[in-house]
C-alpha cells in the first residue's frame, strides 16, 4: 500500500496569518487523519512563515499517525526540533531560508560527510530518515552511502511534463526507482503531485511507499471539501493496480 501523507503547511499559514488559531491546525490535522490519511507532513522553516515550531510540538503530542518533518538540517534549530519531537520520519531538504518552495534535491556526493553525520544523529534516536533527491542515479547511489533509509523523489519535473507526454515524463523516475530498489532504499515522492498526475505515477513507480501532498490537496479541498478531497487522493493511489509479474495495469474504475 502507498501511504498518503498530507502536508498541512498551507493550513498553518492561514492559521498563523493573523496570530490566532483560525482555522485550528490541530483539529484539521485530526480530521484529515479521521478521513483516512496515513500520515501528516510539516515543513517548518527558521522564519516560521508557514508552520511554527510550537505547532509541530503540539501536533506530535496529539496525532495518531506517522509524523514526517521536512526541513534543512543545516539550520541548527531544525535539528534541535526534530530531536526534541522525535517524529516517525525526518526528510532532509536542501532549501534556503528565504526560498519560496523546495526546488531541487541534494548533491549527495558533495554533501556526503555532512549528510552521513546528520543521518546517524537521527537514526541513533530511532527516527526513519529520508533524503530529498532529483531522479538522478548518481545522487541515489550517493544517498545509499549516507546510511539513509529512504529517498524522496522530487517530482516537479514529472508534474510539469505529464500533460504533454506521461511516458516521457516518468522515464527518469522509473530508472531512479529501479536503482533505489536495487540498492535497498525505499521510495517516497512529492512536489506538485495532484489528482490528475498521481494515478499514473503511483502505477509506474516500483517500491513507492509514500507520497507527500500539500498544495494541490489543500487547494482541491476548497472546492470539494476536505473529507471528499482526502478520499479522492486515496482513491487516486488505488486507481491502478500495477502487476510487476505481468507488467499489466488494470483500471479499477
Segments (PLM) and residue ranges:
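Conserved N-terminal beta1-alpha1 strand-loop-helix module at the mouth
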Residues: 1-68, 73-74, 81-87, 142-145, ...
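Hydrophobic faces of well-ordered beta-strands that scaffold small-molecule active sites
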Residues: 2-8, 40-42, 67-71, 90-92, ...
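Alpha-helix-loop-beta-strand connector modules within alpha/beta enzyme cores
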Residues: 49-71, 110-127, 168-189, 233
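Glycine-rich beta-to-alpha transition loops that act as phosphate-gripper elements at the mouths
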Residues: 50, 69-75, 131-137, 189-196
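Catalytic cores of alpha/beta
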Residues: 75-84, 136-146, 193-208
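Glycine-rich phosphate-binding active-site loops on the catalytic face of alpha/beta enzymes
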Residues: 92-99, 150-161, 208-226
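C-terminal helical cap(s) of enzyme catalytic domains, especially alpha/beta-barrels
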Residues: 104, 165, 220-241
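Histidine/lysine/aspartate-rich catalytic loop segments that bind and position anionic ligands
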Residues: 128-180
Amino acid at each position: 500500500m502507498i501511504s498518503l501523507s498530507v502536508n498541512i503547511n498551507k493550513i498553518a499559514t492561514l492559521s498563523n496569518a493573523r496570530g490566532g488559531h483560525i482555522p485550528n491546525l490541530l483539529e484539521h490535522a485530526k480530521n484529515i487523519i479521521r478521513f483516512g490519511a496515513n500520515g501528516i507532513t510539516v515543513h517548518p522553516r527558521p522564519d516560521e512563515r508557514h508552520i511554527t515550531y510550537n505547532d509541530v510540538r503540539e501536533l506530535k503530542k496529539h496525532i495518531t499517525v506517522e509524523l514526517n518533518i521536512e526541513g534543512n538540517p543545516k539550520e541548527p534549530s531544525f535539528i534541535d526540533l526534530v530531536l526534541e519531537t522525535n517524529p516517525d520520519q525526518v526528510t532532509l531538504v536542501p532549501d534556503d531560508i528565504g526560498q519560496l518552495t523546495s526546488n531541487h534535491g541534494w548533491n549527495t556526493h558533495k554533501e556526503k560527510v555532512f549528510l552521513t553525520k546528520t543521518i546517524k544523529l537521527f537514526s541513533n534516536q530511532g527516527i526513519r530518515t529520508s533524503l530529498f533527491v532529483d531522479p538522478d542515479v548518481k545522487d541515489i547511489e550517493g544517498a545509499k552511502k549516507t546510511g539513509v533509509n529512504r529517498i524522496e523523489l522530487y517530482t516537479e519535473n514529472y508534474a510539469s511534463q505529464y500533460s504533454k507526454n506521461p511516458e516521457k515524463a516518468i522515464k527518469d523516475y522509473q530508472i531512479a526507482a529501479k536503482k533505489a530498489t536495487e540498492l535497498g532504499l525505499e521510495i517516497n515522492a512529492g512536489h506538485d503531485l495532484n489528482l490528475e498526475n498521481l494515478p499514473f505515477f503511483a502505477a509506474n513507480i516500483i517500491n513507492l511507499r509514500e507520497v507527500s501532498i500539500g498544495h494541490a490537496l489543500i487547494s482541491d479541498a476548497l472546492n470539494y471539501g476536505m473529507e471528499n478531497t482526502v478520499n479522492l487522493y486515496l482513491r487516486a493511489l488505488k486507481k491502478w493496480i500495477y502487476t510487476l509479474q505481468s507488467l499489466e495495469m488494470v483500471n479499477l474504475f
